[in-house]
Amino acid sequence: LIAGALLAWVGIQMVLVIDLATFLISMSILAFVHIPRPQQSAEGRASRGRFLSEMRIGFAYINRRPGLRGLLLMMFAINMLASLTYFSILPAMILARSGQNEWALGMVQSVLGAGGVVGALLLSTWGGPRKKIHGVMGFCALSFLLGDSLFAVGRSLPVWLVAAACTAVFIPFISGGQETIWQLKVEQDLQGRVLAVKDALQQFFIPVGFLLGGVLADRVFEPAMRAGGSLASTFGWLVGTGPGAGMGLMFTLTCISGTLICLAGYLYAPLKGSLAGPLGDILDRSCDHPEVSQHHVQPL
């Protein structure tokens, strides 16, 4: 996100140099960090084996726990929707609707980055909702509802900047909340296997979203939203017509779909039960850790 902001000022070569430098700094810091070996759990000892068998353990662990499985599927769908719009067509839409104004695109990317930083600072100060699942589903719904809708109807830089801020400020609460849930619910010596499977499945369709986003924009929505197009008379009042309008309509669809998916999580019994349960009644009763004392457990 910050790279998009720097692009207009320093050029692509300097952006790549800065990107490489950040990787080197991160690797250098990690070289001096001591990572303690986690205490072995009974399930962790029982699951030791070959690489493929340990990978299957990660799948089986998630599959046996409906709450974690539901959270995984919800984030899977959210990442898919985000890759259809934010990750693939947002720069093209801004350029199309701003007359190829690179400075406008850089400003939008800057606010996206700044919004994420502000959200992270708020999260570190406040800590987020007491029940973390509220932060995941509630803030995710707000991000789709506010950010996507404003990107859909916006046709000027001020509206896009507000949309970028509304989108990005909630992301740390979403990602931080769901990571907290997984780390609380999975034994420490199993987290490598389980979280690797979780990350792989959540991100599995992101490349597909990249491909579909461009194809849908170029072949379906952009032609349909041109003057006289098949959808122009129906949605033109909302997102306008002409260059970028079809991509604006795509943001409208992800706004509706993403908000409904997040709100539907409240209707899924294992997640709904975790919202209503008392202290320690977290996401999945079936995977509570007996070795974790009550005062160490936070409601999600």
Give each language-model segment a name:
Residues 42, 74-76:
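Short linear capping/connector segments at secondary-structure termini
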Residues 20, 35, 155:
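Short, conserved catalytic or interaction motifs in soluble domains
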